[in-house]
A protein has these predicted regions:
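Regulatory, non-catalytic segments
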Residues: 2-162
């Protein structure tokens, strides 16, 4: 990791927990991205290195960190590394989830190529060097993501949570 001397609050790890809803067709195998807004903005793919996709009624736990961090569980870790280039946590204004699309034939007859995702709860923790507690963002549902209901979900800081 190349440390940027101007980064005063370097991000060392990001953890994302997603509780998938209990309803029929709540889960998805479509790509999902965590986005950071602000001057340090970028997106990260939430894809587990081992295991399946987001399944109905289950929790997905994604850890983004340096490739040599044993807790990192996303694939590919070197392309989804929040430590390289170094991100300044103070330059992150908010976070969001964005659902991508991998078209599959739709058997529901809605004339779309979509695999929806029902979110019961989303929690994001951004761990920062030399800070005892992570910076937290959270949102509760149920909220659906998909072509017929929108692909992006803003996740406020817990101080602003709705």
């Amino acid at each position: 990791m190349a440390e940027n001397s101007s980064t005063r609050h370097p991000v060392v790890r990001i953890e994302v927990r997603i509780q998938v809803g209990p309803n029929l067709m709540s889960g998805t195998d479509d790509p999902l991205f965590l986005g950071l807004r602000g001057a340090a903005g970028r997106e990260f793919r939430l894809k587990l290195a081992h295991g399946g996709s987001l399944r109905r009624g289950r929790e997905g736990h994604f850890v983004l960190g340096a490739p040599n961090d044993p807790a990192t569980n996303v694939e590919p870790p070197e392309l989804n590394d929040p430590t390289n280039p170094t991100l300044d946590a103070n330059a992150i204004s908010s976070v969001y989830l964005r659902k991508g699309l991998e078209p599959i034939p739709n058997v529901r007859g809605l004339g779309e190529m979509d695999d929806r995702l029902e979110l019961e709860a989303v929690a994001v923790e951004i761990s920062v060097a030399d800070e005892p507690k992570p910076r937290r963002f959270a949102r509760r549902g149920p909220i659906w993501l998909g072509l017929v209901c929108g692909l992006l979900l803003e996740i406020p800081s817990v101080d602003e949570a709705i």
